[in-house]
Amino acid sequence: KRQRSKGTKVFALAGKINNVGLIEVPMGTTLREVIYEIGGGIKGGKKFKAVQTGGPSGGCLTEKHLDTPIDFDNLLAAGSMMGSGGMIVMDEDDCMVSVARFYLDFTVEESCGKCTPCRIGNKRLLELLNKITEGRGTEKDLDTLATLGRVIKDTALCGLGQTSPNPVLSTLDNFRDEYLEHVRDKTCRAKQCKSLLTYTINPELCIGCHLC
C-alpha cells in the first residue's frame, strides 16, 4: 500500500497487551509490529481478536488488517482512522457487540445535541445494541444498525457525529458472525453479555455458601 503520510505518530497503546503506554512510531509501521514487537503480544498468550484505533470513534480491525501500514489513508481505507492516537487491543475474551455498545454509549453522552442524526440517531443505535446484548435482538435489527449508521455518517454536522458509527459499522462488517450468534442463538461466545448467560449449580462443588 502506498504511504503518503510522513513523520512519526504517538499512540496510547492499551488493552489486552503485555506492554502498555505511550509509543512513538514512524508512519508506515504496521499494526503487527506495534502489537507484537513493541507491545509484546497478547497478555496470557491468548488469541488476538481486534484492535481499535483512533479513540472512541475509531473502527475495530481484525487479524487480516495486522499488516496494514499505519498512516492516515491506510487506516481510513481499512475502516478506522488515526484520530486521537488511541490503540486498544482486544483478545478472545472480548465481545465485539458489547465493545461497539461501550463506545457508542460514550458518544451519546458526548453529543452536543445540535444535529438530529447525532442526537437522535445514535440513541437509536444504542437502543438497538442494548436490545441485542440483552437477548431481544433480531436479524432485522442488524440491517437497521447498518442503514442508520451510514445515514448518521453522511448527515451529521461535525466530526464526532460523522465518525460515531464507526465502531458499530466496523464490527458489523468484521464480526458479523458474533452479531448473528447474539440474535439467532441468543449466545455470547465471549460470555460478556450477562443476559445471554445461564448459570447452573454443580452439586459436587457446592459448599452451601448461599452467594449464588
Model-derived segments and spans:
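Short cysteine-rich clusters marking metal-coordination/redox-active sites
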Residues: 206, 212
